[in-house]
């Protein structure tokens, strides 16, 4: 069973990096990558059904 929370965090960190931001720089009191969590969650949730088809 995939660890969805870890996948969402990894995706958020990747989205942050691809936008050219350091992952752990502070933004509104939290690491910058956390501001990408909503987008990462949408992407992972969209992909999961296709990964589970096998």
For each predicted feature, which ranges?
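Amphipathic alpha-helical segments that form the core helices of the histone-fold
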Residues: 26-48
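Amphipathic alpha-helical oligomerization segments
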Residues: 2-25, 46-54
């Amino acid at each position: 069973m995939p660890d969805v929370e870890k996948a969402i965090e990894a995706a958020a960190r990747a989205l942050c990096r691809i936008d050219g931001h350091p992952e752990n720089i502070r933004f509104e009191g939290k690491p910058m990558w956390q501001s990408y969590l909503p987008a990462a969650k949408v992407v992972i949730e969209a992909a999961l059904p296709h990964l589970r088809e096998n």
